[in-house]
From Swiss-Prot:
UniProt xrefs under PANTHER family: 60S RIBOSOMAL PROTEIN L35/50S RIBOSOMAL PROTEIN L29, LARGE RIBOSOMAL SUBUNIT PROTEIN UL29C
Keywords, ordered alphabetically: Ribonucleoprotein, Ribosomal protein
CDD domains: Ribosomal_L29_HIP
One Gene Ontology term of the molecular function aspect: structural constituent of ribosome
InterPro entries: Ribosomal_protein_uL29, Ribosomal_uL29, Ribosomal_uL29_CS, Ribosomal_uL29_sf
UniProt name for this protein: Large ribosomal subunit protein uL29
HAMAP family linked to this entry: Ribosomal_uL29
Organism lineage: Bacteria, Pseudomonadati, Pseudomonadota, Gammaproteobacteria, Pseudomonadales
Organism of derivation: Pseudomonas putida (strain ATCC 47054 / DSM 6125 / CFBP 8728 / NCIMB 11950 / KT2440)
Length: 64
């Protein structure tokens, strides 16, 4: 889990790279869930929230 304050210290390029990684993680978790291999279902919502945090910080930085 990431803190929004930690994310605000990163550049937009770093945030975009992190966002891509999180989206890949989310896709892999969804595929594991679909095939019945996902043992830790809480990871889906955790990654979803992390994606939202990164997008929020990116939008805040774009507005400045």
């Amino acid at each position: 889990m990431m803190k929004a304050n930690e994310l605000r210290e990163k550049s937009a390029q770093q945030l975009n790279e992190q966002l891509l990684g999180l989206l890949r993680d989310q896709f892999n978790l969804r595929m594991q869930k679909a095939t019945g291999q996902l043992g830790q279902s809480h990871l889906l919502s955790q990654v979803k929230r992390d994606i939202a945090r990164v997008k929020t910080v990116l939008n805040q930085q774009a507005g400045k």
